[in-house]
């Protein structure tokens, strides 16, 4: 039965949190699939091969582990959406992202299948990754909104800054996926912060790599601003510190990928950490934006006070 605007139940909060953790795990396992070249470890879909699941092969095991996490996540996401529909239709900040996650499930599944059928073309893989991040964002937002206390909203300025950072963060993810699609990881050689001896761009893949770096610096600056605002008690303090920490760790992985270079084991590990780090940064930004609250929802939640007229 739908409940009035207010805090969600403990069971729902933990179910939503479990879904968010599973969604992050999916991104991390997807990174392992990419850096180990296991994307075609299962050449058929949804089964691994035409008749069986050959888990004795490393690539097949890694790829099918990715699909197993997907299956678990679908169950969790549908459960969250059904619960939200039945009990929290008065909480649009919980209901709509939960339903959006369900809508994104078939799109993401189709993209994954197409990627396998077409032998992993770069642009399909990149689009698959971007949609996967949108999927992660909707689930994380649902979980964070479910845990948010209605009586402790952040200031409107903090909320706007948080959402602005989310938008720039999504641009960073999209350009990063483009770097992968174009195989432009080494477009700047092993140079950082410079690119091919300078900072100017001269066309080609270097442009995309430089754009990716500039967006990363911008997100870092915005995350630092969020931390300053949060420490001044204008936003969630603990959550406000997470984005800058995640961004700094992620930038370290990115710099090491460039400096180390090569195609060795260390390079592969760093690439995997960079993909997982991207999911962590994105989740931290979305969670902070959700926890900062929606002033419109807060106003709607307050009871209307009517002052009786004084007879003259």
Give residue ranges: language-model regions:
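Polytopic transmembrane helical bundles with strong interfacial aromatic enrichment
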Residues: 1-312
């Amino acid at each position: 039965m739908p409940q009035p605007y207010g805090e969600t139940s403990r069971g729902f909060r933990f179910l939503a949190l479990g879904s968010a953790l599973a969604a992050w795990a999916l991104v991390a396992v997807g990174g392992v699939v990419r850096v180990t070249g296991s994307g075609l470890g299962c050449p058929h879909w949804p089964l691994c091969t035409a008749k069986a699941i050959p888990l004795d092969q490393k690539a097949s095991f890694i790829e099918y582990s990715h699909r197993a996490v997907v299956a678990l996540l679908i169950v969790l996401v549908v459960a969250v959406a059904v619960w939200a529909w039945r009990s929290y239709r008065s909480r649009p900040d919980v209901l709509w992202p939960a339903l959006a996650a369900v809508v994104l499930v078939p799109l993401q599944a189709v993209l994954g299948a197409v990627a396998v059928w077409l032998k992993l073309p770069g642009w399909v893989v990149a689009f698959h990754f971007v949609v996967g991040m949108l999927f992660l964002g909707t689930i994380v937002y649902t979980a964070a909104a479910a845990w948010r206390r209605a009586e402790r909203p952040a200031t409107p300025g903090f909320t706007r800054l948080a959402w602005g950072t989310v938008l720039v963060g999504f641009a960073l993810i999209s350009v990063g996926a483009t770097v992968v699609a174009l195989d432009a990881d080494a477009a700047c050689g092993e140079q950082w912060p410079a690119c091919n001896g300078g900072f100017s761009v001269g066309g080609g893949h270097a442009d995309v790599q430089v754009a990716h770096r500039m967006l990363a610096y911008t997100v870092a600056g915005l995350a630092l601003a969020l931390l300053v605002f949060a420490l001044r008690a204008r936003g969630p303090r603990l959550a406000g510190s997470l984005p800058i920490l995640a961004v700094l760790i992620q930038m370290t992985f990115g710099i090491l990928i460039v400096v180390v270079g090569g195609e060795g084991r260390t390079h592969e590990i760093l690439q995997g950490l960079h993909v997982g780090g991207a999911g962590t940064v994105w989740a931290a930004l979305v969670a902070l934006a959700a926890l900062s609250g929606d002033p419109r929802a807060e106003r709607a939640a307050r009871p209307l006070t009517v002052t009786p007229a004084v007879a003259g």
